[in-house]
Regions:
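Hydrophobic, aromatic-enriched alpha-helical segments typical of multi-pass transmembrane helices
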Residues: 2-249
Length: 249
């Protein structure tokens, strides 16, 4: 017949069991914390708000959007003739810029989980995100100014339109490309994103960076929409996946 264990031995075994269970719980909490990517859903919000603003402006406008280098009369016709349409686009851009700033924190958090080069990758993500958000906001404010008295004079209208396109076009695309590239690389290193999506992010980043060629040749303008819309798609899908991963962790 088995002898009952002494009381002190029972107490020691109970303590050991509780300690082991506590360590398991702590490990689980650490894993959940490491997978936390705050504000990940700001990725799809950045794309949705930008596209909604553009679509709303197109639907409400009475004249075509002035292309880069357009005559001041064409700029006035759009911004002064359809100020409501232009302001819809402005709101969409400002919401998108705010969302990008928030999403930058998510990408930086993901970059911190990389095993190697995490500090450099995080700094790259923050730099690209800040440039992308600031340049898009600058472009939106220029567009808003064009709907007011600043858009009435040829000289000021032309200058604002040039600044608006430069900030919201090649400058924004380059910064956004850096951010999306950091997202793709962090996704590859951590395994938090599907490999095809992470590689798509790197390809999109290349297009975004090449948009800077617009300052050298007009042919570089084609890289702007290529980098922007592919980047919005990648960041949107990645944001949904990262948010879902956090909820199930």
């Amino acid at each position: 017949m088995d002898q009952p264990l002494p009381t002190h031995e029972l107490i020691e075994r109970l303590r050991a069991g509780l300690s082991s269970d506590g360590r398991k719980v702590q490990v689980g909490l650490d894993v959940a914390t490491s997978l936390r990517v705050p504000g990940a859903l700001s990725g799809p919000l950045a794309g949705a708000s930008f596209i909604a603003g553009v679509a709303g402006a197109v639907a409400l406008s009475d004249s075509p959007y002035p292309r880069p280098g357009a005559q001041p009369a064409d700029v006035r016709r759009y911004f002064r003739g359809s100020p409501g349409a232009a302001r819809v686009s402005v709101v969409g851009q400002l919401v998108s810029a705010t969302s990008l700033a928030w999403f930058t924190a998510s990408v930086a958090k993901l970059a911190e989980q990389s095993e190697r080069g995490s500090r450099g990758l995080r700094a790259t993500a923050v730099s690209g995100g800040v440039l992308a958000a600031a340049s898009l906001a600058t472009s939106a404010l220029c567009a808003a100014a064009l709907t007011g008295s600043r858009g009435e004079q040829d000289a000021s209208a032309a200058a604002l339109h040039r600044l608006m396109f430069a900030a919201g076009g090649p400058v924004h695309s380059a910064g956004f490309g850096v951010l999306v590239g950091a997202l793709g690389l962090a996704g590859l290193r951590t395994g938090e994103l599907p490999r095809p999506l992470a590689i798509a992010g790197l390809v999109s980043a290349t297009a975004g960076l090449l948009s800077s060629l617009y300052f050298v040749t007009d042919h570089g303008v084609w890289f702007i929409p290529a980098g922007r819309f592919s980047g919005l798609l990648v960041s949107g899908v990645a944001g949904v996946l990262l948010a879902r991963r956090f909820r199930t962790s």
